[in-house]
C-alpha cells in the first residue's frame, strides 16, 4: 500500500464525541476534532485561526489514554495510512508504515510478506504512530529492537523532523515523546529495520508452553508459529476492548534495585521476578496486584479484570474518574503491602 498523496484540506468537527476513539469507551467530548490523513494537514492546522491557539491532542487508537474530563481543544485523529518497503540491503528490509496504521495489522502484513521480527508484539492495541511513544513491548521484545527512524511534525510549527533511535531516547515503556516531547509532536510515519536472518525470541515460558501445546518444538518454530502463539495467549488473557472497555496492561512492571528486591523476597519468597542485565529486577505488577486481593474487584463501574489483574476494565458507564480512583487505590495497597510503587501506562487527561 503506497503512502497517501498530499492533501492539506482540513475539516474540523465541533463538539466531537470521543467514546469511540478510546479503548476504555469513556464518554468525553472534544471542542474540535480533525481527521488527519496526510502530514500537510498539520501545517494547515497550524495556520487555521479557529484552532491554532487551542491545546492539541494526537489520538491514534486511543489505547493509551484515560479521559477524566472533556478536552477543551482540538483532537487530531491520526489516520495516516500506508505500508511499504522503502529499501533493502543484504542484511535487512526497511519497512515504513503510516502513523495511523493499526499496529497488529501491520505486524501481520510484515509476516505475510516474509519479513519476520515483530511477531512477539502481535495483538498489542493501538497504532504504528503510538508504538514508539510507548516503546511497546511484550514477551521479551521491545519495539526499539527493530526501530530505524520516524518522521514527526512539530505541532507548534507544522514542520517535519526525522528522529533516529538515539534522539528518541527509548526506555522501558518510555521515550522522548513521553517526556520532553510530550504533546509537542505528531508521528507521521515509522520505519523499521527487519533483519533477513530471523532470530526467534522465546525467553518467556508462556510462549514456549503455547508452542508445546500446539505440538511445535521451540527450535522448530517459525515466525508465524510465534505470532499465532502470542495471539492465542493474549486473546486468552486479555479482554477484547470492543466487548469490555480497557487499555490493555494498565501498570508498568516495576523495576527495583537488588537490595530492595532482596528485602521484598525475604517477605514474599514467591514473588514473580525477572533479573535485568544491569543488575536490577523487574517485578510482575499483575502478581503484586493479585496478592493485594484486587483481581475481580470493582470500584463503581471500573473493575480489575477477573483473569488478568494488570488490566482495568469499564464494566459499563465508567468515567475516567472511576478508573483513576481504582488505579490509585491499587497503587496505595501495593505500596503499603510491598513497598513498591506502580506507575500507570496510560496518560490520564
Curated annotation (Swiss-Prot):
It is an enzyme of class 1 (oxidoreductase). It catalyses: UDP-N-acetyl-alpha-D-muramate + NADP(+) = UDP-N-acetyl-3-O-(1-carboxyvinyl)-alpha-D-glucosamine + NADPH + H(+). Pathway: Cell wall biogenesis; peptidoglycan biosynthesis. It is found in: Cytoplasm. Keywords: Cell cycle, Cell division, Cell shape, Cell wall biogenesis/degradation, Cytoplasm, FAD, Flavoprotein, NADP, Oxidoreductase, Peptidoglycan synthesis. The keyword Oxidoreductase applies. Residues 24-197 form the FAD-binding PCMH-type domain. The active site is at residues 173, 249, 345. Its cofactor is FAD. The keyword Flavoprotein applies. GO terms for cellular component: cytosol. One of its GO terms (molecular function) is UDP-N-acetylmuramate dehydrogenase activity. InterPro entries: FAD-bd_PCMH (IPR016166), FAD-bd_PCMH-like_sf (IPR036318), FAD-bd_PCMH_sub1 (IPR016167), FAD-bd_PCMH_sub2 (IPR016169), MurB (IPR003170), MurB_C (IPR011601), MurB_C_sf (IPR036635), Oxid_FAD_bind_N (IPR006094). One of its GO terms (biological process) is peptidoglycan biosynthetic process. SUPFAM superfamilies: FAD-binding/transporter-associated domain-like, Uridine diphospho-N-Acetylenolpyruvylglucosamine reductase, MurB, C-terminal domain. Its EC number is 1.3.1.98. Belongs to the MurB family. Cell wall formation. NCBIfam families: murB (TIGR00179), PRK00046.1 (NF000755), PRK13903.1 (NF010478). This is UDP-N-acetylenolpyruvoylglucosamine reductase. It comes from Burkholderia lata (strain ATCC 17760 / DSM 23089 / LMG 22485 / NCIMB 9086 / R18194 / 383). The lineage of its organism: Bacteria, Pseudomonadati, Pseudomonadota, Betaproteobacteria, Burkholderiales.
Amino acid at each position: 500500500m503506497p503512502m497517501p498523496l498530499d492533501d492539506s484540506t482540513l475539516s474540523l468537527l465541533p463538539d466531537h464525541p470521543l467514546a469511540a476513539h478510546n479503548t476504555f469507551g469513556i464518554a468525553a467530548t472534544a471542542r474540535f476534532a480533525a481527521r488527519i490523513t496526510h502530514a500537510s494537514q498539520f501545517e494547515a492546522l497550524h495556520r487555521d485561526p479557529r484552532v491554532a491557539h487551542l491545546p492539541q491532542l494526537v489520538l491514534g487508537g486511543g489505547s493509551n489514554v484515560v479521559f477524566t474530563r472533556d478536552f477543551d481543544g482540538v483532537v487530531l485523529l491520526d489516520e495516516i495510512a500506508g505500508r511499504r518497503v522503502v529499501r533493502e540491503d543484504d542484511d535487512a528490509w526497511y519497512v515504513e508504515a503510516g502513523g495511523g496504521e493499526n499496529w497488529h495489522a501491520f505486524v501481520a502484513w510484515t509476516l505475510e510478506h516474509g519479513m519476520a521480527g515483530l511477531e512477539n508484539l502481535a495483538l498489542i492495541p493501538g497504532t504504528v504512530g503510538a508504538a514508539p511513544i510507548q516503546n511497546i513491548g511484550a514477551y521479551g521484545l521491545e519495539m526499539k529492537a527493530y526501530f530505524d527512524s520516524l518522521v514527526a511534525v512539530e505541532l507548534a510549527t507544522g514542520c517535519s523532523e526525522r528522529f533516529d533511535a538515539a534522539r528518541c531516547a527509548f526506555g522501558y515503556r518510555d521515550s522522548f515523546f513521553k517526556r520532553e516531547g510530550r504533546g509537542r509532536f505528531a508521528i507521521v510515519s515509522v520505519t523499521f529495520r527487519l533483519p533477513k536472518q530471523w532470530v526467534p525470541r522465546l525467553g518467556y515460558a508462556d510462549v514456549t508452553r503455547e508452542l508445546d501445546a500446539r505440538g511445535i518444538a521451540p527450535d522448530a518454530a517459525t515466525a508465524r508459529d510465534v505470532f499465532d502463539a502470542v495471539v492465542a495467549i493474549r486473546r486468552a488473557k486479555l479482554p477484547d476492548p470492543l466487548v469490555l472497555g480497557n487499555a490493555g496492561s494498565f501498570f508498568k512492571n516495576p523495576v527495583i534495585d537488588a537490595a530492595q528486591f532482596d528485602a521484598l523476597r525475604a517477605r514474599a519468597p514467591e514473588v514473580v521476578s525477572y533479573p535485568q542485565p544491569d543488575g536490577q529486577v523487574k517485578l510482575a505488577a499483575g502478581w503484586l496486584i493479585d496478592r493485594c486481593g484486587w483481581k475481580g474487584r470493582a470500584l463503581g463501574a471500573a473493575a480489575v479484570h477477573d483473569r488478568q489483574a494488570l488490566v482495568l476494565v469499564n464494566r459499563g458507564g465508567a468515567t475516567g474518574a472511576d478508573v483513576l480512583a481504582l488505579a490509585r487505590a491499587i497503587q496505595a495497597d501495593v505500596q503499603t503491602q510491598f513497598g513498591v510503587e506502580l506507575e500507570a501506562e496510560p496518560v490520564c487527561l
